[in-house]
């Protein structure tokens, strides 16, 4: 005997499925349409009914998918064609300006790091030049002493003169001039070399930083606290070349002037003055 086809109708939250689960049929009895027509009428009617339902369901699912796709495209077109509101425009402008400022700040930091590396290289070269000049000055000083001894021994008979002076006296005067010139060069090198400068702030605070014209007001230098029974002293060491600088302290997020240093300017333009000799 043949087995009756079992029809499964399943529903889920994501999709609807219609499936036919045909159990094993006796193919010998269903090899022609006449055999199918001999099935009981209720079974045939039920089979036709479920077949129609499956077609309707397929059409419904295709329609729903098409409507959803069309709806999403319509929403996208509407959002693109709709003009920006004032708040959206302000937010867009703020984001654009923020991106520009971040880019400029990054470029400034890169330039600052490059200049610092160059400064360290120049400081090293200046130190080497100063050392070489100091050694040369010692040698010239020894030659000056030797020339003085020769001049003090007296002028041998037959000694020639240069510019109205005997060669012994002429040599001594020339060595003196060279020694003075080298001392001036050493002073110039020392003026170009950075010096340690102690900067401090006295008062009660959690954090203290200093900025100044010594680096173009681009970096904040942190000051370390030193506690005592009477007060708190924040200090740091800067390496600066001789000159006049202006600076200001950032104390707990507020710009302040230290009474320990002289000032220049008025109002918001008032700054402390730092002189490096």
From Swiss-Prot:
Residues 1-44 form a transit peptide. One of its GO terms (cellular component) is chloroplast. It is found in: Plastid, Chloroplast stroma. Keywords: Chloroplast, Coiled coil, Plastid, Transit peptide. Involved in targeting GBSS1 to the starch granule. Was originally thought to be a carbohydrate-binding scaffold protein, but it has been shown that it is mainly found as a soluble protein and that interaction with GBSS1 is a pre-requisite for subsequent starch granule binding. Dissociation from starch as a function of pH, Mg(2+) concentration or redox state is not observed. Interacts primarily with amylopectin and is required for amylose synthesis. Contains a C-terminal (199-277) carbohydrate-binding domain (CBM). GO terms for molecular function: polysaccharide binding; starch binding. It comes from Arabidopsis thaliana. The keyword Chloroplast applies. The gene is PTST. Induction: Circadian-regulation. Up-regulated during the day (at protein level). Pfam families: AMPK1_CBM. GO terms for biological process: regulation of starch biosynthetic process; starch biosynthetic process. InterPro entries: AMPK1_CBM, Ig-like_fold, Ig_E-set. It comes from the Eukaryota. This is Protein PTST, chloroplastic. Gene3D superfamilies: Immunoglobulins. Interacts with GBSS1.
